[in-house]
UniProtKB/Swiss-Prot annotation:
Family to which the UniProt record says this protein belongs: Belongs to the protein kinase superfamily. CAMK Ser/Thr protein kinase family. SNF1 subfamily.
Segments of skewed composition (Low complexity): 1-15, 599-611
UniProt-recorded name of the protein: Hormonally up-regulated neu tumor-associated kinase
Natural source organism: Homo sapiens (Human)
Domain Protein kinase: from-to ranges: 62-320
Length: 714
């Protein structure tokens, strides 16, 4: 079970360099034993929870008194996650106020649904969704940089290079939305926030719409958004498309470069505003703007949506990509997914081993971007860990042994310091300690020499004494081994090298990901149905007799159950008729596998029903078929005439082999009463001539259930 809210609390804040007594100094080390995260990351000081001003607690969140924003039916407040100690933004929607607006009531949960469909570094991350009787809560990441509009008010206007950076991030986020089929419809300066790294974060998907993905009818026919940022086709109440977001980006770009809006009318009138947009009567631009910026801005504010560029064309603009060194966004099938390699192993291990969550639940929730408490814990812990690593001068302080192993990709030092630490380890004092170990321990120690240890060790080691020749040989072998490890494809330490588990080790045989909880996350290949041609039946040679071969199966065209089919979807071409060869005489049945012994396509072999259950007369047919006889068409046809020289048998008699092969007319009781009777062969040809030679065994009884399953009872 997941840990309680107070399980991860520390008595004192684990701030770097903080003073305290002997008991306080021992607490971080105790928290680090057997842990996968630093104590500063995994623990929450009690003072942080006590000093946070709040008026309510909902789930694992404290709803703070500080208000970040307010709308007609919703308020955004600062919150605190009690399990991680991280601050979040909580949007509280009042259901009573929302009921007054039919549009809001109908689409109350749409914002949360849309935000779970997307994941982008310039879009706020939705962490959790909670609902009570009176309120609906959306928990999102907090952007401490504030609103971009406040920054424009302070500076009056932004420089062209800074505005270009913001506009490119905004276009990248909108392009990601459009690839996911989402149109924002309310892009304005007030909905652009800044994070701690001064990057754009797009918020407020309350008016966003999804192009038919979420099942909403007529998605592009409503009047929405602020009129100053709305495209002309929106003001004219015409049908519109994703290019309305391109127009809004142009308005935001004009506001960043000038500090004002491009189209304004006094007094305000929608008709006059629309006419000014159509006539391209834009307010004057600053003279210091470059030609490329002006040309790009005018293309975004094109009133004709046909001539206006789409979001992909805008992202490829030359002025926008000038001096840009970032990565080009790649087209992905699922815009809300991340790859397995992007997960933080330390955070996943902490959640599974310390907080008690299942490994498969954590991985599946994070990869699928499903807003719940698991995603919130992972995101906040990972963000806290990144902030801890970036703020530490020496990342090895307060880190435990396992953390260095599982975070080797992030904790790996540069090459220069890496080689320097290796040379330090080759000095006499440390090598004397290595030589005292056993050979196996010495080999393991040599494999782990590449880790950059703490600075305290460097002060105690001598700096001038040279190692002996045997020690130099060990150094060279160690360096060669480390180079091989660097060249390997795996970015995490192997289990055999460090004696630890790798939760993201892919097995080549089963194509699965082995987790630390002995569970397996399947990574199946694409399931593409393919037609498998049925092999042609064996044609007897000119010298062969009518007696079938020993190895010929007694059951032909067997219907396989779902349990006997492999992972690939096979579409088998079966013959029109299915004849099941079943003998009621004391003979032995050839050993078959489970798929051949199963007559029922729905139940596995060996499943039995009570014998008194009546058997459906059309499910199972009993036939002795001659291999040399021509194939017969299946249908409601009359039985072939019986030869005149043979004894006549009634049509429904169990001794009439041919009539039983087509129309079994007796019930389960008759078959059970006749099961000990011997079959009367026809006079023209003995029955033994059409059967393969079989070894005599003990008599067997056949029991039939309603699902056509056959089970031998000795």
């Amino acid at each position: 079970m997941p840990a309680a809210a107070g399980d991860g609390l520390l008595g004192e804040p684990a701030a770097p360099g903080g003073g305290g007594g002997a008991e306080d100094a021992a607490r971080p080390a105790a928290a680090c034993e057997g842990s996968f995260l630093p104590a500063w990351v995994s623990g929450v000081p009690r003072e942080r929870l006590r000093d946070f001003q709040h008026h309510k607690r909902v789930g694992n969140y404290l709803i703070g008194s500080r208000k970040l924003g307010e709308g007609s039916f919703a308020k955004v407040r600062e919150g605190l996650h009690v399990l991680t100690g991280e601050k979040v933004a909580i949007k509280v929607i009042d259901k009573k106020r929302a009921k007054k607006d039919t549009y809001v009531t109908k689409n109350l949960r749409r914002e949360g649904q849309i935000q779970q469909m997307i994941r982008h570094p310039n879009i706020t991350q939705l962490l959790d969704i909670l609902e009570t009787e009176n309120s609906y809560y959306l928990v999102m990441e907090l952007c401490p940089g504030g609103n971009l509009m406040h920054k424009i008010y302070e500076k009056k206007r932004l420089e062209e290079s800074e505005a270009r950076r913001y506009i490119r991030q905004l276009i990248s986020a909108v392009e990601h939305l459009h690839r996911a089929g989402v149109v924002h419809r309310d892009l304005k300066i007030e909905n652009l926030l800044l994070d701690e790294d001064n990057n754009i974060k797009l918020i407020d998907f309350g008016l966003s719409n999804c192009a038919g993905i979420l099942g909403y009818s007529d998605p592009f026919s409503t009047q929405c958004g602020s009129p100053a940022y709305a495209a002309p086709e929106l003001l004219a109440r015409k049908k519109y498309g994703p290019k309305i977001d391109v127009w809004s980006i142009g308005v935001n770009m004009y506001a960043m470069l000038t500090g004002t809006l491009p189209f304004t009318v006094e007094p305000f009138s929608l008709r006059a505003l629309y006419q000014k947009m159509v006539d391209k009567e834009m307010n004057p631009l600053p003279t210091q703007l470059s030609t490329g910026a002006i040309s790009f801005l005018r293309s975004l504010l094109e009133p004709d949506p046909v001539k206006r560029p789409n979001i992909q064309q805008a992202l490829a603009n030359r002025w926008l990509n000038e001096n840009y060194t970032g990565k080009v966004p790649c087209n992905v099938t699922y815009p809300n997914r991340i790859s397995l390699e992007d997960l933080s192993p330390s955070v996943v291990l902490h959640m599974t081993e310390k907080l008690g969550y299942k490994n498969s639940d954590v991985i599946n929730t994070v990869l699928s971007n499903r807003a719940c408490h698991i995603l919130a814990i992972y995101f906040l812990l990972n963000k806290k860990l990144e902030r801890y690593l970036s703020g530490k001068s020496d990342i090895q302080d307060s880190l435990c042994y396992k953390t260095r192993l599982y975070q080797i990709e992030k904790y790996r030092a540069p090459k220069e310091s890496y080689e320097a630490s290796l040379d330090t380890w080759t000095r006499d004092l440390e090598f004397h300690a290595v030589q005292d170990k056993k050979p196996k321990e010495q080999e393991k120690r040599g494999d782990f020499l590449h880790r950059p240890f703490s600075k305290k060790l460097d002060k105690n080691l001598p700096s001038h004494k040279q190692p002996s020749g045997s020690l130099m040989t060990q150094i060279q072998n160690t360096k060669a081994l480390l180079k091989d490890r660097k060249a390997s494809k795996s970015s995490f330490p192997d289990k055999d090298s460090f004696g630890c588990r790798n939760i993201f080790r892919k097995t080549s045989d089963s194509n699965c990901v082995a987790s630390s909880s002995m569970e397996f996350i399947p990574v199946p290949p694409p399931r593409t149905p393919r037609i498998v041609k049925k092999p042609e039946p064996h044609q007897p040679g000119p010298g062969s007799t009518g007696i079938p071969h020993k190895e010929d199966p007694l059951m032909l065209d067997m219907v396989r159950s779902f349990e006997s089919v492999d992972r690939d979807d096979h579409v088998e071409v079966l013959s029109p008729s299915h004849h099941y060869r079943i003998l009621n005489s004391p003979v032995s049945l050839a050993r078959r596998n489970s798929s051949e012994r199963t007559l029922s396509p729905g139940l596995p072999s060996g499943s039995m029903s009570p014998l008194h259950t009546p058997l459906h007369p059309t499910l199972v047919s009993f036939a002795h078929e001659d291999k040399n006889s021509p194939p017969k068409e299946e249908g409601l046809c009359c039985p072939p005439p019986v030869p005149s020289n043979g004894p006549m048998q009634p049509l429904g008699s169990p001794n009439c082999v041919k009539s039983r092969g087509r129309f079994p007319m007796m019930g389960i009781g008759q078959m059970l009463r006749k099961r000990h009777q011997s079959l009367q062969p026809s006079a023209d040809r003995p029955l033994e001539a059409s059967l393969p030679p079989l070894q005599p065994l003990a008599p067997v009884n056949l029991a039939f259930d309603m699902a056509d399953g056959v089970k031998t009872q000795c």
